[in-house]
């Protein structure tokens, strides 16, 4: 069986989940559900990164010990993912004992291989990003995102990259990491690799909240090293767990390991992480999906200091869970930073969900109930105009998958919106009320069957996004189980007999 292992970043547990976390995690969940629809066995890993200076200082400011602080925030992430209908298979925490033991074993292994040496780190450090900087603006003392930098000089353990510089340059240059969008690979080469890849400091001396170096308890393992390995400590890679072979370290040509990340952490995932795996003789992920930032209406990165942060709760309150999932996925592009505001998402919600997908279901349901007493059997379409729509529907099934596999979600969705729009015009042209009045039942049934076929295809294809709504729609029309399956979607004859429910509620109420 084809298998796909999907990860979100292990989010830093210094606060509650925000819209950026929600978008990445919804994206991961939709990809997982899409893979399962297409015959894969899939696994989704989420979690929280719980060590480091930032955590320790924030906990102290609240008069909490670090573990209590991260317990509270990890629980907030878990609850949010359950609210957003995220079908995660495991929530890993870097404070889990099984994770800590494997990280220490890995650090010891690198030391035993003489890949780690002791020296002195001198440069700038960003507490917010948990990131070292060799080069930085000494006048502003701000990191690339805009957080304050502090000067640091301390002894620590480094990992040598001298033997891997050519390897990582070739690996990225030949697109062997399959970084999407491709522009991210160019950014990595131009901004980091071409400037010389410095050895990386793997420990901090003055950080107490973290995993200790096994052979030097005065040093704490760098939070990024700790966090990256959570992707495979979850699978017990150091403990002989068969899940590591099943999901990651195997020779299956159809093996897929997909990391979802935001662009500011691409360097850690697409340079350092592959190097770590290479040095340990572990197979690389098959794809890195690096999306842009979510910015406000003025193009500014969302931050608490600017008071422009949108919480997932705000969106859920306005648009519901499925509406939030849909609007974020439809609006966000992976290859650029995306402007986002409640007003922008409201336009999408009203236009796409309330007026198009939702209204088409209501209209179809109402016509079958009014004109056919709630019953409709399979129809052979002979009318030319309706035949064209049916062809368009069949073609959309293939095209939808093409766009979805390319992560062009807005294009995939627009295919279906076009069908709904064309069919809406045909309904107005055919005037079903007159067909009923004139007892032209053959044409009326063909029209309504085409409408039902459109409902079926749209909601089966959109099931990974509109999870709850799709289930409601299938129940409204009493679709047979086979008619709700993606692998049977080309077969319209599965709509043998439609018997609609007695009543329906509006699927997507307009938001004013």
Swiss-Prot record:
**Gene3D superfamilies from the entry?**
2.170.220.10, HUPs, Isoleucyl-tRNA Synthetase, Domain 1
Q: What is this protein called?
A: Methionine--tRNA ligase
Q: Where in the cell is it found?
A: Cytoplasm
Which positions in this protein are listed as binding Zn(2+)? Answer: 126, 129, 143, 147
GO cellular component terms listed in the entry, alphabetical order: cytoplasm
Query: Which GO terms of type biological process are on file?
Result: methionyl-tRNA aminoacylation
Q: Which organism is it from?
A: Mycoplasma genitalium (strain ATCC 33530 / DSM 19775 / NCTC 10195 / G37) (Mycoplasmoides genitalium)
Its job:
Is required not only for elongation of protein synthesis but also for the initiation of all mRNA translation through initiator tRNA(fMet) aminoacylation.
Q: Which domain of life is it from?
A: Bacteria
Q: Which family does it belong to?
A: Belongs to the class-I aminoacyl-tRNA synthetase family. MetG type 2A subfamily.
């Amino acid at each position: 069986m084809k298998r796909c292992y999907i990860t979100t970043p292990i989010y830093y547990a210094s606060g509650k989940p925000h819209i950026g976390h929600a978008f990445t995690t919804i994206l991961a969940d939709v990809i997982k559900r899409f893979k399962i629809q297409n015959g894969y066995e899939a696994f989704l890993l989420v979690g929280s990164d719980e060590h480091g200076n930032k955590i320790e200082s924030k906990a102290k400011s609240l008069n909490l010990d670090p573990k209590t602080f991260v317990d509270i925030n990890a629980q907030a992430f878990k609850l949010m993912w359950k609210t957003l209908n995220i079908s995660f298979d495991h929530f890993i925490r870097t404070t889990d004992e099984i994770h800590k033991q494997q990280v220490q074993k890995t650090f010891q292994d690198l030391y035993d291989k003489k890949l780690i040496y002791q020296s002195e780190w001198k440069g700038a450090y960003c507490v917010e990003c948990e990131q070292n900087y060799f080069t930085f603006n000494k006048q502003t003392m701000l990191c690339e995102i805009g957080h304050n930098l502090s000067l640091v000089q301390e002894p620590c353990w480094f990992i040598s990259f001298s033997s891997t510089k050519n390897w990582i340059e070739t690996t990225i240059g030949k697109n062997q990491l399959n970084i999407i969008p491709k522009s991210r690979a160019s950014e990595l080469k131009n901004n980091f690799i071409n400037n010389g890849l410095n050895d990386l400091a793997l420990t901090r001396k003055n950080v107490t909240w973290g995993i200790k170096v096994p052979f030097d308890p005065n040093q704490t393992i760098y939070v990024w090293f700790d966090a990256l390995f959570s992707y495979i400590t979850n699978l017990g890679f150091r403990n002989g767990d068969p899940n590591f072979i099943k999901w990651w370290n195997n020779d299956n040509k159809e093996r897929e390991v997909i990391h979802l990340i935001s662009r500011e952490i691409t360097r850690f995932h697409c340079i350092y992480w592959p190097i770590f795996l290479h040095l340990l003789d572990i197979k690389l992920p098959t794809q890195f999906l690096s999306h842009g930032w979510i910015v406000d209406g003025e193009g500014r990165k969302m931050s608490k200091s600017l008071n422009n942060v949108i919480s997932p709760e705000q969106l859920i309150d306005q648009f519901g869970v499925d509406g939030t999932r849909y609007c974020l996925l439809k609006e966000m592009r992976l290859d650029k930073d995306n402007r986002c505001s409640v007003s922008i998402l409201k336009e999408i919600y009203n236009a796409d969900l309330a007026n198009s997908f939702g209204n088409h279901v209501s209209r179809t349901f109402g016509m079958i109930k009014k004109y056919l007493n709630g019953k409709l059997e399979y129809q052979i379409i002979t009318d030319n105009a309706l035949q064209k729509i049916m062809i368009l529907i069949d073609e959309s099934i293939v095209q939808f998958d093409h766009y979805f596999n390319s992560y062009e979600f807005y294009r995939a969705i627009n295919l279906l919106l076009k069908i709904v729009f064309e069919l809406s015009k045909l309904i107005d042209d055919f005037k079903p009320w007159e067909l009923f009045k004139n007892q032209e039942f053959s044409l009326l049934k063909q029209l309504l069957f085409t409408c039902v076929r459109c409902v079926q295809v749209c909601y089966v294809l959109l099931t990974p996004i509109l999870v709850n709504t799709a289930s409601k729609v299938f129940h409204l029309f009493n679709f047979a189980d086979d008619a709700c399956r993606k692998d049977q979607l080309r077969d319209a004859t599965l709509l043998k007999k439609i018997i609609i429910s007695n009543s329906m509620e509006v699927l997507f109420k307009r938001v004013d």
